[in-house]
Swiss-Prot record:
Protein name: Probable saccharopine dehydrogenase [NADP(+), L-glutamate-forming]
Pathway the protein acts in: Amino-acid biosynthesis; L-lysine biosynthesis via AAA pathway; L-lysine from L-alpha-aminoadipate (fungal route): step 2/3
GO CC term, one of those recorded: cytoplasm
Gene3D superfamilies: Dihydrodipicolinate Reductase, domain 2, Domain 3, Saccharopine reductase, NAD(P)-binding Rossmann-like Domain
Pfam family, one: Sacchrp_dh_C
SUPFAM superfamilies in UniProt: Glyceraldehyde-3-phosphate dehydrogenase-like, C-terminal domain, NAD(P)-binding Rossmann-fold domains
Keywords: Amino-acid biosynthesis, Lysine biosynthesis, NADP, Oxidoreductase
EC number of the protein: 1.5.1.10
GO molecular function terms noted in the UniProt entry: saccharopine dehydrogenase (NADP+, L-glutamate-forming) activity; saccharopine dehydrogenase activity
Lineage: Eukaryota, Amoebozoa, Evosea, Eumycetozoa, Dictyostelia
Amino acid sequence: MKNILLLGSGFVAKPALDYLLKREDYFVTIVSLFQNELDSITKGHDTSKFKTIQLDVMNKLNELEEYFPKSDCVISLIPATLHSTVAKLCIKHKTHLVTASYISDDMKALSEEAKEAGVLLLNELGLDPGIDHMSSMKIIDHAKENGGKVTSFVSWCGALPSTECADNPFGYKFSWSPRGVLSSATLSANFLWEGHNEEVPANIKWAVLQPIVVEDSNGVKMEFDGVPNRNSFPYIEQYNLNAKDVTTMFRGTLRWKGGFGIMIRALVAVGLFSTEVDARLAVEGGISWRNYLVQLLGCNDNDSDLLYCVESTIKEYFEKLKTERDGLQFHFPIIPRDIEKDVQHAVEGFKWLGLLSADEKVVNKNTPIDSLCALLEKKLSYKAGERDVVVLEHNFVVQYADRTEKEVSSLICYGIPNGSSATSLTVGVPVGIATELIADGKTTTRGVVGPVTPEFYLPILEKLKSENIEMIETKQEIKK
């Protein structure tokens, strides 16, 4: 019998657990503070195959130490800040570890110690990071083995409501706290595009959207706005590419065409992305969003004045962004904006959110952005029976001695209505598969690593196919 210790019971845990409990010779101990989540993710499973422990893992991890030496592998799905603490216990008891998170500096520092203990600390086993890196390295390694060199890499990834559920001005919904999404929306981006080092300031990132079309297996074209994602330069080294060969290195995020970028820019324009504590939010008896906007913008509290003030503030900000964007002379394709049309979309979005209504009360979270998050969490949540979709696409240009090819690797995965979301499936299932490989003794690498070598990515990607999570690969020669 193989024993697995699973820490955490969030939305990713169920697909990982479901995968592992398909094995008759696996026993899983699941630990979480939340008994309702433990009951939910284990519902329907044979009670002889698992054990649940209700415990505050974040503060009482030491109480679980006895389970580490008894386990063939530990899965950490608790907050990433605790992974290194879990890893130290794994090293102490010579037990392997799987996480879905990026390799932190604290985790990386444990690599030599883990090697000496004969322990594998395998990270980045989700979608992004995870499937994205594995599918990229599969193409890159295959190209190198056949004498090719990668000159261009463009990768897009998005987790979105499926088209029939994208029924709001954002074209987006949240299945967990919006704070992380909003925070990342205001980060700058750096990348290499056709030999040009592009630096996109945080404030104009959502004004430099690229038009992206991804075709599904039925030939249906899905239209997106693409936005650059943080710093793409480190991936030249991470993917073992020759910097002298690479002219384009870009990683970006997908949103449905038309809405999200407009709404983000408009909310920034009126000051709702501020992270400063604002005492006006804490007024006794509460404050409406309308009243708060009136105070933020300094206008009269009547419909015509407020509407004019909102429209003019957003328009002025959009024009400012366009001027700044045009002055930077970027070299990548950018969707031209109709400012008047975008302003009207934003205003209708404000009305839909209730920002112009005296009836929509602010849930005070001390800062404008956190109070906005509370509103978005209420308005942009998934309803019963709705599903999400994950879209991942890599585009490579590979030069061979006698030809140049465009190679595309793409994944479209839909969530299950009233079941696991596509996001949770594409994170939890890879975690489960990696755990199975380790527990079955099919890995030899030790230390702190991601799944970017054939030892990991080949079997994991192959097993994902049987779970209906498959990267479809195509190639086409580029005629000169």
